[in-house]
Amino acid sequence: MIRVNSLQVDSRLLPLSLQANAGEVWHVIGPNGCGKSTLLAALAGMIPFSGSVQVDGLDVSQASLSELARHRAYLAQNNKPSFQLHVFQYLALSVPANVALECSEVASEIDQISRLLNIDDKLHRSIHQLSGGEWQRVRLAGSCLQVSPVLNPSARLLIWDEPAAPLDIAQESLLYRLIERMAGQGLTVIMANHDLNRTLRHADQVLLLSRGVLYRAGSAKEVLTQEVLQSVFGTSIRRVELEGHPHLLFD
């Protein structure tokens, strides 16, 4: 369980609280500059904050980076490293330090996750030969290996900042299959997202931020209303039903 009490990051993010359960998928949404990345970095223990964040009882503000790495994976928006590395080497570095790379579980997890993300034919490529979407899928695979319950029983949380940003439509579908897999294994997934229709379909809980303030929190149905979204995003939005499913239309 993830418990957050009065989390604040100076004037960038005003106090907010939440409680997230195992297997839940949380989307953090809001206009650019509203505090999404700040919130995720604080939850991951990467920047100073006031208040408290606990991941399965671990006090994030007091934990070392190695302790945090055992309990959560954090994927920020990032460029490729400048040094030379092959995909399989990058994935090997993502495996928990106390797990032998030779064990069958590691090979199985790498195989399953790389196949799911359609990167199994790229394991022997240099990361500098990858497109933006390919590199992002490799990074997603690495973060999942870090907190795979099969390899790391202490893992509880996946934190992703705009994981779909570099992906095309087909690759984005693979991402949401991966999210379903990881949540199904009992991990809590907290991610920033810009595609509100994806949030409407896939999020168990939604945090809507506006100018550093938690404007609304609740289920997708409760938060993604026409009135609320128009107020925060300042644009005309309609919610329609198509083949029995809700969709948001933007002018």
From Swiss-Prot:
Membrane topology, as annotated: Peripheral membrane protein
Annotated localization: Cell inner membrane
EC number(s) on file: 7.6.2.8
Location, primary (coarse class): membrane
Cellular-component GO terms for this entry: ATP-binding cassette (ABC) transporter complex
Transmembrane segments: none
Keyword flag DNA-binding: no
Keyword terms: ATP-binding, Cell inner membrane, Cell membrane, Membrane, Nucleotide-binding, Translocase, Transport
Protein name listed in UniProt: Vitamin B12 import ATP-binding protein BtuD
Organism whose genome encodes this protein: Vibrio cholerae serotype O1 (strain ATCC 39315 / El Tor Inaba N16961)
Organism lineage: Bacteria, Pseudomonadati, Pseudomonadota, Gammaproteobacteria, Vibrionales
